C-alpha cells in the first residue's frame, strides 16, 4: 500500500497522534513517553486545534527540544500557544489559512512528491483538516485527516485514505 497509517493513540483520555508514512505526524496530544519512540522519524507536524487531547504543550515543547529543525504546520490561532507555551521558534511554524485559501496546495517537504492542503472544520474552536497528496512513486494517492468535527466537506470524495478521529 502506498500509505502507512500508524495510530499512536486515538482516545480522548490518552490523546491523539497519527503517523502517516512513518514521518508525517497529525496532532500531538499524547505524552512524550508515548511519542518518544517515533520522534526521530517525524519530518513534519500537522496540528488541528488547541484542545489538549490534540495539542499537548509539554510534548510539543519536548519534541521541539529533541528535534530543533522540525517544523509545525498550523492555522494562525495556534501560533501564540506554540511560541509562548511550547517555545517553538516562529521560524519553525508554517502557516496555513484554510478559511482564506481553501484547497491551496503547499509544498512544505521540498524535494519530495508530497504536497498538502488544509480545510476548515466545524468545531467549538478553530479546527483544521488536512489533505496529503503523493503524486509520484509506484502508488500515488491522496489521504485526508479530519478530527472533532460535525461535518466533512462534500468536496472530499475520491480520496484513497480517510482518517477521521472523533471522541
Feature roles, as predicted:
Residues 31-78:
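Active-site metal-binding motif and surrounding structural segment of the metallo-beta-lactamase
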Residues 1-40, 128-148, 161:
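Conserved beta-strand hairpin/beta-sheet module of binuclear metal-dependent hydrolase folds
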Residues 74-140:
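Metallo-beta-lactamase
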Residues 19, 35-40, 81-87, 153-158:
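Short loop/helix-cap segments at secondary-structure boundaries that form the rim of catalytic
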Residues 156-167:
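Cap/insert and terminal regions of metallo-dependent hydrolase folds
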Residues 14, 33, 51-55, 79-81, ...:
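Active-site environment of divalent metal-dependent phosphoester hydrolases
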Residues 22, 42, 67, 90, ...:
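Short, well-ordered alpha-helix to beta-strand connector turns
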Amino acid at each position: 500500500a502506498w500509505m502507512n497509517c500508524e495510530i499512536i493513540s486515538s482516545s480522548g483520555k490518552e490523546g491523539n497522534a497519527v503517523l502517516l508514512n512513518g514521518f508525517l505526524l497529525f496532532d500531538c496530544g499524547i505524552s512524550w513517553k508515548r511519542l518518544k519512540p517515533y520522534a526521530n522519524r517525524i519530518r513534519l507536524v500537522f496540528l488541528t486545534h488547541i484542545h489538549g487531547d490534540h495539542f499537548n504543550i509539554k510534548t510539543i515543547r519536548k519534541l521541539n527540544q529533541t528535534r530543533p529543525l522540525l517544523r509545525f504546520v498550523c492555522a494562525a490561532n495556534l501560533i501564540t500557544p506554540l511560541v509562548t507555551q511550547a517555545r517553538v521558534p516562529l521560524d519553525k511554524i508554517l502557516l496555513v489559512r484554510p478559511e482564506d485559501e481553501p484547497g491551496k496546495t503547499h509544498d512544505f517537504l521540498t524535494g519530495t512528491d508530497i504536497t498538502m492542503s488544509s480545510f476548515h472544520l466545524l468545531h467549538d474552536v478553530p479546527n483544521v483538516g488536512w489533505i496529503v497528496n503523493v503524486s509520484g512513486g509506484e502508488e500515488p494517492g491522496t489521504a485526508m485527516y479530519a478530527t472533532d468535527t460535525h461535518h466533512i466537506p462534500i468536496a472530499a470524495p475520491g480520496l484513497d485514505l480517510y482518517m477521521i478521529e472523533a471522541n
